[in-house]
């Protein structure tokens, strides 16, 4: 039987682009582990993706995961858009490169070994774990120490 794990995520950006951070909580059998990091220049969508990626990559074996995010971008990307992007060689319907492709590919790889149920929660609406992730993400964004090497300035 697969271990049942809950993951809660959030990303934050002070300016978009600007300094950003992510926060994630991984819960298994009542125990929690938190993750957060801040980047000097990034976007909110990249930080939303990073939160999910880092938490999933921390899992050491196949798990049944309920992943809660307040990001429609992440939820729709993974449940609706990614299959078409992959078929088209990571291009959008209008044949443009998928934005944040480095992180989408990393998330896709992290998902491969787990059974995932995606849940959307309304941000800033009092959901306790989402609020905690938001606090982690904002604190990391206010004290960025990393460079987001995959971030590309849009022309």
Curated annotation (Swiss-Prot):
Question: Where does the record place it?
Answer: Cytoplasm
Q: In which family does this protein belong, per the annotation?
A: Belongs to the RNase H family.
Q: Which Pfam families match?
A: RNase_H
- PANTHER family in alphabetical order: RIBONUCLEASE H1
The note on cofactor binding and number reads: Binds 1 Mg(2+) ion per subunit. May bind a second metal ion at a regulatory site, or after substrate binding.
CC terms in the record's Gene Ontology section: cytoplasm
The entry marks the following residues as binding Mg(2+) 1, namely: 10, 48, 70
Q: Its Enzyme Commission number?
A: 3.1.26.4
Q: Which residues bind Mg(2+) 2?
A: 10, 134
Record's subunit section: Monomer.
Query: What is the official name of this protein in its record?
Result: Ribonuclease H
> Which InterPro entries does this entry report, sorted A to Z?
RNase_H (IPR050092), RNaseH-like_sf (IPR012337), RNaseH_domain (IPR002156), RNaseH_sf (IPR036397), RNaseHI (IPR022892)
According to the entry, every stretch annotated as the RNase H type-1 domain falls at: 1-142
Q: Name one GO molecular function term.
A: RNA-DNA hybrid ribonuclease activity
Which metal ions or organic cofactors does this protein require, according to UniProt? Mg(2+)
